[in-house]
Amino acid sequence: MSTGIKKLQEEYKFIRKSGILVSIKGTAKPVQKDILHWFGFIEGPKNSPYDKGIYYFEMKFTTDYPNKAPIDVRMKTPIYHENISNSQGHICFSYLSNWQNKNDIAGIAFAIFDLLRYPNPGNPYNSTNLSKAKEFNQNYAMRQQTYDWNNSWDIGWNF
């Protein structure tokens, strides 16, 4: 058995037993019995355009893991985000491009969560994604302002 497969099995046991992804209301696990193919999900960060959403992602590994980054990490839930491909869900983020063998699956999930909370407009997937995501985020900000303004009238008086 390769060290990559052993490492993935260890990480699966750790994720299940430790509950490490509970803080982001998520999980990750192998697809059926294929330890090299994983699905996971996270809940969108609070007070962000992705709040209350459930975001699924997929990861594919080689037996060279963790010495080599996953060969594919992508969002499965359609999303407007400047660092995520609208059509294929490919994610453009530094956690993968700066891969080190100490990185792990939980780290990937946390990096995706952080990317939803703090998009990186300096490194967009492409210019179309950047403009659509900006529009989506502006609409979110307007909805929040309207919501706050409307709720400011509720001061508890009964007429």
Give the ranges of each region predicted by the language model.
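Short, cysteine-centered beta-strand-loop-beta hairpins and adjacent loop/turn segments enriched
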Residues: 45-52, 64
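N-terminal leader/pro-regions and domain N-caps
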Residues: 1-33
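Proline-anchored loop/turn motifs at beta-strand termini and strand-loop-strand connectors
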Residues: 59-70
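Eukaryotic intrinsically disordered and solvent-exposed regulatory patches
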Residues: 24-27, 42-45, 59, 78
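Domain-scale recognition of soluble eukaryotic interaction modules
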Residues: 2-15, 41, 69-159
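A short beta-strand-loop element at or near the start of a globular domain
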Residues: 36-40
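Conserved, non-catalytic sequence blocks in retroelement Pol enzymes and Pol-derived host proteins
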Residues: 29-32, 46-47, 99-104
